[in-house]
Amino acid sequence: MTEPRRRWTAAEDALLWDLYQVQEKAPTGKCQKINWNEIARHIPGRTNKDCRKRYYNRFTGGLRKGSWTQEEDERLFRLVERYQYRWATIAQKMETRNADQCSKRWHHCLNPELERSPWTVDENMLLLSAVNTHGSSWKDIQKCHFPTRSANNIKNQYTILSRKNISLAPAHLHPCCDSPSPSKSSRRPPSTPTSTPQVPGSRQGSSYDPYDYGSLSSTPQLSATDYLPATPEAPAVNFDMAMGAFGDSCGYMPQYQPSPSFYANSPDGSELMMPETMGMRMRYDFRDGLEQEGVRYPGQETFGY
C-alpha cells in the first residue's frame, strides 16, 4: 500500500525550483533532458514523478486546465504514436498541457487497450474487496486486480458503488447465487409436462398437453362415449324428461308422499300420491346420442304436451 500524500512545503518548492534551474542549464538526463531522478535525490521523501508533477503544476504558467478538446486528444494520440511514453517531450510538443496531464489523459482515457465495458457484479464485488485490502490506493488495485482498467475508472466506479450504498457481501455468499430458491408452491408449472396425462378411454395416438393451448385446435374432438368404459349391448335406458328420473331398467318411479301429519283430510296421504308420471316421456339412447319420440307405457297415460 502506498503512503498517503503529503503536501509540499514552501521550503520544498524553493529547493525544487533551484534544482530545476541547475538541470535546465546543464541537463544530465538522457538526450540532454531534465534529470528528474537527480532532482528527487536531493528532496527527501519525493520521487522523480512527484518532482516533475509539482514543477509543472506549480511553476509552469500558460498551461490549460480542465476538459480536453477533441483537437488536443487527436494531437496527443499522434504524439504518443511518435514518441511513445516520453511525456516531457510530448508536453513540449503539446504546448498547452504539461507532462503529467498528457500521461493521465492517455492512461485514463485514450489508451485503446483500456477496458471500457460496463462493470459486472463480480467485478464490483472484487473492487469492494480490494478496497478493504488496499484502501484508496487505486494504482495498487489496478495493478493487482484490474490491469485492463484505468485507475481513474476504478476510482469512479467505487464512488458510484458508495453512493448507491452497495457493500461487500459475506465471503461465503455471492450476490449472483445466494438468493433463496422459490418455494415449490410459488413455482410455475413447466411449459412442457414431464409426462403426458392420459385421458381414460382416449384414442390411441392422440396426445394431450394441458399447458399447450395451441394443441386444442389440432386434437380430435372426443364424444361422450369416449369417456365411458366399454359395455355389452343393453336395452336403451328410458329417461323421463319431465320428472328428471330414470325409468325402465333403473326400476325407479318418483312418488311424492308427504307426511300424513300435515294433511288432516288425507291421513294416509293417498290423495297426494301420483301414480301417473306427468309430462312427455322421451327416450335417450346413450349409445348413439339420439332422442326418440314419446313412448306410451301400459297402464300409464302419456300427456301430449
From Swiss-Prot:
CDD domains: SANT (cd00167). InterPro entries: Homeodomain-like_sf, Myb_dom, MYB_TF, SANT/Myb. It is found in: Nucleus. SUPFAM superfamilies: Homeodomain-like. Induction: Expression is induced during co-cultivation with Streptomyces rapamycinicus. Residues 5-59, 60-110, 111-162 form the Myb-like domain. GO terms for cellular component: nucleus. Residues 198-207 have a biased composition (Polar residues). Disruption phenotype: Results in a significantly reduced expression of orsA and orsD, and in complete loss of orsellinic acid production, during response to Streptomyces rapamycinicus. Pfam families: Myb_DNA-bind_6 (PF13921), Myb_DNA-binding (PF00249). One of its GO terms (biological process) is mitotic cell cycle. The keyword Repeat applies. Its main location: nucleus. PANTHER family: MYB PROTEIN-RELATED, MYB-LIKE DNA-BINDING PROTEIN BAS1. This is Myb-like transcriptional regulator basR. It comes from Emericella nidulans (strain FGSC A4 / ATCC 38163 / CBS 112.46 / NRRL 194 / M139). The gene is basR.
